[in-house]
């Protein structure tokens, strides 16, 4: 990643960020404007914690030890922009409901699933999805289903391993290589896997730079 990309990422993520909207269904989506970067993953994979680490604000995205807490598409943008057509923020981060939470009522799971899939298929300003994978568990069946959906919808995505501090450091390179091999033939997958630990702050700068590069493409 170039020094310029790192500087640009620092300029965006160095600003204060704010929560602007929770979206329980597609009709409540904000008007299409800034580029959107979304975060998908299984329940309790650490999406909210990773967003907080990215923007340097521990309390921005609500975190919980209870799987399935995030039930809406939650929108976050850098502060200081009016939102008018000539003063849009450079990007919006979207925290998506987690999938794969078996204890939630089926109707609730179905509603979350429909919201996520409709959003992924139909949002023209969505530039990239970061699919978070718990480093302790690897890619599961329902992760594969989401990757297949993204491939079918031709939505660019990149795999991000989370909670790498929970496994032995020596195992991280092997896990990165194994994960990359699993997605190698997927048409919409970006051919690089990132590793992060929100708790330790590891890989956060690299993820910021990757997001900035994706937005600039």
UniProtKB/Swiss-Prot annotation:
Domain named EngB-type G: residues: 33-217
Matching Pfam families: MMR_HSR1
GO molecular function: GTP binding; metal ion binding
Gene3D superfamilies per record: P-loop containing nucleotide triphosphate hydrolases
UniProt: Mg(2+) binding residues: 48, 70
Annotated signal peptide: none
Membrane-spanning ranges: none
Cofactor(s) the protein needs: Mg(2+)
Record GO biological process: division septum assembly
GO cellular component term, pick one: cytosol
Residues the record lists as binding GTP: 41-48, 68-72, 95-98, 162-165, 196-198
Record keywords: Cell cycle, Cell division, GTP-binding, Magnesium, Metal-binding, Nucleotide-binding, Septation
PROSITE patterns membership: G_ENGB
Keyword Chaperone among record annotations: no
InterPro entries for the chain: G_ENGB_dom (IPR030393), GTP-bd (IPR006073), GTP-bd_ribosome_bio_YsxC (IPR019987), P-loop_NTPase (IPR027417)
NCBIfam families with a match to the protein in the record: GTPase_YsxC (TIGR03598)
Protein family: Belongs to the TRAFAC class TrmE-Era-EngA-EngB-Septin-like GTPase superfamily. EngB GTPase family.
Protein role: Necessary for normal cell division and for the maintenance of normal septation.
Record's protein name: Probable GTP-binding protein EngB
Organism from which the protein derives: Sinorhizobium medicae (strain WSM419)
């Amino acid at each position: 990643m170039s020094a310029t990309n790192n500087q640009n990422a620092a300029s965006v993520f160095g600003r204060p960020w704010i929560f602007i909207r929770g979206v329980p269904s597609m009709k409540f989506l904000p008007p299409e404007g800034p580029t959107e970067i979304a975060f998908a993953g299984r329940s309790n994979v650490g999406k909210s914690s990773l967003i907080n680490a990215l923007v340097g604000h521990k309390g921005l995205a609500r975190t919980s030890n209870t799987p399935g807490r995030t039930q809406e598409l939650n929108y976050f943008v850098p502060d200081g922009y009016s939102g008018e057509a000539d003063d849009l923020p450079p990007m919006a981060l979207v925290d998506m409901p987690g999938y794969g939470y078996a204890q939630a009522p089926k109707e609730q799971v179905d509603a979350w699933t429909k919201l996520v899939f409709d959003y992924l298929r139909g949002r023209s300003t969505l530039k990239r999805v970061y699919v978070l994978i718990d480093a302790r568990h690897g890619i599961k069946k329902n992760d594969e289903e989401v990757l297949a959906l993204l491939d079918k919808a031709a939505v660019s995505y990149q795999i991000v391993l989370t909670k790498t501090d929970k496994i032995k450091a020596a195992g991280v390179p092997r896990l990165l290589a194994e994960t990359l091999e699993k997605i190698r033939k997927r048409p919409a997958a970006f051919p690089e896997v990132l590793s992060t630990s929100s708790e330790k702050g590891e890989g956060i700068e690299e993820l910021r730079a990757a997001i900035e590069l994706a937005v600039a493409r």
